UniProtKB/Swiss-Prot annotation:
Gene assigned in the entry: gmk
Annotated source species: Psychrobacter arcticus (strain DSM 17307 / VKM B-2377 / 273-4)
Cross-referenced PROSITE patterns: GUANYLATE_KINASE_1, GUANYLATE_KINASE_2
Family, per entry: Belongs to the guanylate kinase family.
Catalytic activity field: GMP + ATP = GDP + ADP
Primary localisation category: cytoplasm
Keyword terms: ATP-binding, Cytoplasm, Kinase, Nucleotide-binding, Transferase
HAMAP family linked to this entry: Guanylate_kinase
Protein name: Guanylate kinase
GO molecular function, one term: ATP binding
């Protein structure tokens, strides 16, 4: 059985990472693809778990060797998604989440046309500013850069299949789970999962 690919995008500070973390903790057969990046690790981040941290030279080499499904430069740092890793997980029947920006999402959609695209929005710019400031991961200069680009990022929601407003964490999480569950009940997924059962059911009907 082949897994489904879920692309989740949001402006920085929207709460995407926290939602995905909780979703993974409560959902079976679901994983998140670990991206490659040239940015410095933040406090508490582990190489190979949160990101594959690398330098610019190695990243550029990987691009030249077509190792990435998508790659982009964001605020002076490079980010990319390994195609080999994603395909291996999908082929193993695992549903895969890509946490990437809208540019990368559109790149991946051209390759995986069945990918399910989800955009998460904050309830307001004021809330977004507060969240970016409260988490204490970036300087005020970086926060202002992120806010300046946020409007353009959020305008891309129109290219996605689903939109979630993260005003209430538990509500947003429930809505995110609902998308995963609904996909797993589609005809295509159920035929893959229960092919033998369905064949036996129809065979019994014919025999009678």
């Amino acid at each position: 059985m082949t897994g489904s690919l879920f692309i989740i995008t949001a402006a920085s500070g929207t709460g995407k990472t926290s939602l995905v973390k909780q979703l993974l903790a409560t959902t079976n057969d679901l994983t998140v693809s670990v991206s490659h990046t040239t940015r410095d690790p933040r406090p508490g981040e582990i190489d190979g778990h949160h990101y594959h941290f690398t330098d610019v030279d190695n990243f550029v080499t990987a691009i030249s060797e077509s190792q990435f499904l998508e790659h982009a430069e964001v605020f002076g740092n490079y980010y990319g998604t390994s195609e080999q890793s994603v395909r291996a997980q999908l082929d193993a029947g695992v549903d895969v989440i890509l946490e990437i920006d809208w540019q990368g999402a559109l790149q991946v959609k051209k390759i995986f046309t069945d990918a399910i695209m989800i955009f998460i929005l904050p309830p307001s710019i004021a809330t977004l500013r507060q969240r970016l400031s409260t988490r204490g991961q970036d300087s005020m200069e970086v926060i202002e850069q992120r806010l300046a680009g946020a409007v353009n990022e959020m305008a891309q929601y129109i290219n996605f299949d689903y939109v979630i407003i993260n005003d209430n964490f538990e509500v947003a999480l429930t809505e995110l789970k609902a998308i995963i569950v609904a996909d797993r009940q589609t005809l295509k997924r159920q035929q893959q999962r229960y092919q033998r059962t369905i064949t036996n059911l129809l065979s019994n009907i014919v025999d009678k």
